[in-house]
Every structure is written in C-alpha cells, then in structure tokens.
UniProtKB/Swiss-Prot annotation:
Organism the protein comes from: Buchnera aphidicola subsp. Macrosiphoniella ludovicianae
Pathway: Amino-acid biosynthesis; L-leucine biosynthesis; L-leucine from 3-methyl-2-oxobutanoate: step 3/4
Location within or outside the cell: Cytoplasm
Name of this protein: 3-isopropylmalate dehydrogenase
Keyword Amino-acid biosynthesis: yes
Enzyme class, UniProt record, top EC level: oxidoreductase
Binding-site residues, substrate: R99, R109, R139, D228
Major localization class: cytoplasm
Gene for this chain: leuB
UniProt keyword terms in alphabetical order: Amino-acid biosynthesis, Branched-chain amino acid biosynthesis, Cytoplasm, Leucine biosynthesis, Magnesium, Manganese, Metal-binding, NAD, Oxidoreductase, Plasmid
Organism placement in taxonomy: Bacteria, Pseudomonadati, Pseudomonadota, Gammaproteobacteria, Enterobacterales
SUPFAM superfamilies assigned to the protein according to its UniProt record, in alphabetical order: Isocitrate/Isopropylmalate dehydrogenase-like
GO CC annotations on file: cytosol
Length: 365
C-alpha cells in the first residue's frame, strides 16, 4: 500500500497566496501523474490569521501542522501590521513559534546560480561562475548568540551597556555536523565548516566537535574557514564550495551573502527540519507586499520549496529531481518573470510561469 502524505499548506500574507497557487499546480501533478497519495489542508498564518482570528498562529493551524508530515509555508508580514508591538507582528508571532514548537534545529538554504541567469549576479564578470554555482548553506537554528543567556541592556555609573552570550552545547554541534556530512554524501562529498576559532571559545568547541564527527565520514572532505575569510572566499570563487556548515549567527550572514550573488532571491527555497525529519519549507524571500496582487511575483522559489519537501520530507529524490529539472528546462527556453528578465517588456506573469513549469513536469522536460 502506498504511503499517504499529509501536507499543511500555510500561504500567509503578501505574495504568499499567489505563489502558493502555482505550487498547488505541481502538487496536483504529483497526485495525478505520479500517483502520490497527498492529503492537503490549508490553514491561516501570519497577518491574515491576526485579522481573522486575533492571533498570528491559531491553535487549529498548530494542530493541523502537528497532524501533518510537512509544512509548506508561503510568507508572512507586511506594512499593515508594522504598528503592532514587535513580539505580536506576524513574522515574530508565527514563524518563530513554529520553529520552536517543532524543534526545527537546522536550516537548509540552497544558493544556486543557473548559467542562464548569470547576467543577474553581481559576480557575472567572473569566469569562475560561467557555468553557475550550487552551494548549500546549513545553518544551526536553535542555539548560539540569538538564544544564549544572559543577555540584556543595563546602566551602571551613568554608562549604558548591552550584552549577549554565545552558547553552544556539544550535542547541538554534534547533531548538525552529522546532518552536514550525511548531506555531503548526496552531493560532492565536501563540507566547509565556518567558525572564528582563533578568537571565540564557542567556535573552538565547534571546530573540535566538527572535526571529531568527520572521522565517521572518511569519504567526505572537511575544511575549516574563519567567518571573515569565508565572506571573501565566497565572493572570490563561490564554485569552490559545496556545503557550508555554520552556527546560527554565521549562517544568518553567509546564507544571505550566498543568496544575493545568485541575483534574485525569488529563485531561492529553504527548509528547516528537526531530528525526526519533520520540516517547514518556504521561499527564502519575504512577503513582498509592494508587488502583492500584481501577478508578477516569481513562483519558482515556492515551487522549489515544494521540491525540497519532496526530497527531504518524502524522501522521493527522483521526483524532486524532475521538479528541479522542469525549472531548469523553462529557464533554458528563455521563460522569465519580471525579477529575472533582462527585458522589462517581455516577461511571464506569476500564473504563466507556474503553467510552463507544470507543463514541463508533465512532459518530462
């Protein structure tokens, strides 16, 4: 008997509902053409949930996610809710509690530059990226300086000061290191661990444990870079990297650097997962309220987020590869949305891009 997959779909705010409609087209193809048994249930999240139910993360949404195998997330937030206290705004009051509730301790951020879109990259003149690049940034999500205690802001002798604490426990580093090495075996068998071990004790522990874990993966090549050198090396030659293994803070920095050198954040998916392989899959960009409702948003990041769900959440790598290949196929044919077009007078609308990707998937292109 074939497994039935349950997906909680959370379109959210801004362009979220628009691009999610295009992901639905791919989901229907998975059901009808690939004979996957997928149960889809949609729930409110973020600003729309605040407006309708008074909270950004309603109880029925959380329960729906608990009863699912994965979460397909759109985007949350917008100017409409910026007058609220920061802790009640959609971004803070929905996405962060979801991550905490499900203990989503690591984030996968692919940064892929397609050769057809090289003209978008700030590094387009570099010969080293003429064929594009493909980096996977693995970021620890639940430890480090964003969560360490003590933290605060105080005043002493009329002098104000603030402090945060970088804390990492050995088990936190150990588990994400295993994730990185296991994923490296599905790619190019290369891991570059990022730290500041020449200055920080937390980074020294990070390097020691990552090195120790690497002994279990003799087929995977491990290298180490200090964060300051890594930021330069990525700009100099991104092709030298495959997997970047990062702490929370360093991963926050490097994943955005990797994103911007691809030229369009509208192309980039992401996934946050826990030890049971339960994950939340979402575009790396935001809700983009300035273009919401105009049918010009790029749906590719949302579609590729679904592909990541199929790859990591369902463990159906061959089908995920076919979704990825469909995106590559339409790019090779010259199809573009506004954000990735070099001709502002010739680009596809959001729904049109979804249609051509769906057709490519059906036709096996």
């Amino acid at each position: 008997m074939k497994k039935q997959y349950r997906i909680a779909v959370l379109p959210g705010d801004g362009i979220g509902p628009e691009v999610m409609k295009e992901a639905y087209k791919i989901l229907k193809i998975l059901q009808n053409y690939f004979s996957l048994h997928i149960e889809i249930k949609e729930f409110n999240i973020g600003g729309i949930a605040l407006d309708k139910e008074g909270v950004a993360l309603p109880k029925d949404t959380l329960l729906g996610c608990e009863n699912s195998d994965a979460i397909l997330f759109g985007s949350v937030g917008g100017k409409k809710w910026n007058n609220l206290p920061i802790e009640k705004r959609p971004e803070r009051a929905s996405l962060l509690p979801l991550r905490k509730h499900f203990n989503l301790f690591y984030n996968l951020r692919p940064a892929k530059l397609y050769s057809e879109l090289r003209f978008l990259s700030p590094l387009r003149s570099k010969t080293x990226i003429k064929n594009g690049f493909d980096i996977l940034c693995i970021r620890e999500l639940t430890g480090g300086i964003y969560f360490g205690e003590p933290r605060g802001r105080l005043k002493k002798n009329n002098i104000e000061y603030a402090f945060d604490t970088e804390v990492y426990y050995d088990y936190e580093i150990n588990r994400i290191a295993h994730v990185a090495f296991q994923l490296a075996r599905t790619r190019k068998n290369k891991v570059c661990s990022i730290d500041k071990a020449n200055v920080l004790n937390s980074s020294l522990l990070w390097r020691e444990i990552v090195t120790k874990v690497s002994k279990n993966y003799p087929d995977v090549h491990l290298s180490h870079l200090y964060i300051d050198n890594a930021t330069m090396q990525i700009i100099q030659n991104p092709n030298q990297f495959d997997i970047l293994l990062c702490s929370n803070l360093f991963g926050d920095i490097l994943s955005d650097e990797c994103a911007i050198i691809t030229g369009s954040i509208g192309m980039l998916p992401s996934a946050s997962l826990n030890e049971k392989n339960f994950g939340l899959y979402e575009p790396a960009g935001g809700s983009a309220p300035d273009i919401a409702g105009k049918n010009i948003a790029n749906p590719i990041a949302q579609i590729l987020s679904l592909s990541m769900l199929v790859r990591y959440g369902m463990n159906l790598k061959k089908i995920a590869n076919k979704i990825d290949q469909s995106v590559i196929s339409v790019l090779k044919k010259g199809y573009r949305t506004f954000d990735i077009s070099d001709d502002n007078n010739x680009f596809l609308k959001t729904n049109e891009m979804g249609d051509v990707i769906a057709d490519a998937l059906i036709n096996g292109e």
